[in-house]
Amino acid sequence: MEKLWGGRFQGKSEAWIDDFGASISFDQKMAKEDLAGSLAHVAMLAKCGIISDSEASEITAGLKILQEKLALGELEFSTVNEDIHLNIEKLLHEEIGPVAGKLHTARSRNDQVATDMHLYLKEAVAEIIQSLKHLRAVLVQKAEANVETIMPGYTHLQHAQPISFAHHLLAYFGMFTRDLERLEESVKRIDISPLGSAALAGTTFPIDRAYSAELLGFSAVYENSLDGVSDRDFIIEFLSNSSILMMHLSRFCEELILWTSHEFQFVELTDAFSTGSSIMPQKKNPDMAELIRGKTGRVYGNLFGMLTVLKGLPLAYNKDLQEDKEGMFDTLETVHTSLDIFAGMIETMKVNADIMEESTQKDFSNATELADYLAKKGVPFREAHEIVGKLVLECTQNGIYLQDVAFSHYQEIHPLIEEDIYTVLASKTAVQKRNSYGGTGFDQIHVALANAKKTL
């Protein structure tokens, strides 16, 4: 089959080489965007008098036929035509004849593919933003139901201080809020039209780039044609933002995996988000959480792959840039699906509040409360720290906890300790008293929830 760019060539191509160079197997995902870009381009060509109105009408009609066929799944693509751009041009030629050749006036595949990617990513990121907003709403709802659910707070995966489970959930709400802000802020760098940059240097035709950008819903055009076709930093930024987002999902998934284990039993995932074992009948595995954790590495790989593709490219377009799409497509699908799966897990999981709180009774996470108690009575904190540390050692040797120590022994340890110490050492009291701004105290949690709701 004759190639659309074959005028300069005499030798025949070979199918196996065509297959290696073709991108239609994956860039056909952008068929809708490619057709939209072509419709805007032909309208601009007619407006500027570069093609006649009748030619524009024929081309437009042909493109709309292709849009209808695409919606019905009736378009067939070929590796002989390499990519989505040449495939559509060939299909258009079959629909309307030689006038289809005028569509590519004042346009290169270089600005065409860049335009397609900007359009595709803009719409896909908007969908991810909506999924992320939904997840944030789910977290707020779950936190609101667990303000007074007490759990161990951890450092080094060791019990540190008791906290509200809502406080833990709202910590991730803050992380996902920053993820949302990064994605929303990045849209202005995606929402730029490279169309009209042509191959690299612009065109000799009197085009109106602002008009085609307006038709496509872009907010701006690239100010430099070379920049417009050469860079993929808008994709790298998306991949970077996605990597941070997936990292946050992965951290939470790691905790869910731990919490669902027999050793913790803090939460239970519904059957829909769990799987069994082919040999062990009792198993209920948190596979969806594990998959999100695993897919995080995949998204990281897409980021590093894209950075590596670009790091040595001289301006302007190089065929290496064909490798910019699969990682972007994969990341978009992975992030979107992961967000929806994760939101479903959180929304439906059962919280074992009694087990969580009981866990705080069998540790020394209230040791800081005793040290603070002494400090508030005038004992220098470092001295109080030393006193409590020695008492913890003594308790571990005797197999008891701070709340089990006899009051008479507390007075031997320090005469300023009074009988209210047992109330101070209670987990719920310890949590409630941490009412500094941003703390885990119940009053602060209600403030945080109110603030969070304002941002939903």
From Swiss-Prot:
Reactions catalysed, as given in the entry: 2-(N(omega)-L-arginino)succinate = fumarate + L-arginine
Alphabetically, the GO molecular function entries are: argininosuccinate lyase activity
Instruction: Return the protein name.
Output: Argininosuccinate lyase
Which cellular component terms (GO) are annotated to the entry?
Answer: cytosol
Record has Lyase as a keyword = yes
Keywords for this protein: Amino-acid biosynthesis, Arginine biosynthesis, Cytoplasm, Lyase
The record's section on PANTHER family has: ARGININOSUCCINATE LYASE (PTHR43814:SF1)
Species whose genome carries this gene: Listeria innocua serovar 6a (strain ATCC BAA-680 / CLIP 11262)
Gene Ontology BP annotations: arginine biosynthetic process via ornithine; L-arginine biosynthetic process
Q: What Pfam families does this protein's entry cite?
A: ASL_C2 (PF14698), Lyase_1 (PF00206)
Q: What is its EC number?
A: 4.3.2.1
In terms of Gene3D superfamilies, this protein maps to: Fumarase/aspartase (C-terminal domain) (1.10.40.30), Fumarase/aspartase (Central domain) (1.20.200.10), Fumarase/aspartase (N-terminal domain) (1.10.275.10)
Q: What is the lineage of its organism?
A: Bacteria, Bacillati, Bacillota, Bacilli, Bacillales
- The gene designation is argH
Q: Which HAMAP family match?
A: Arg_succ_lyase (MF_00006)
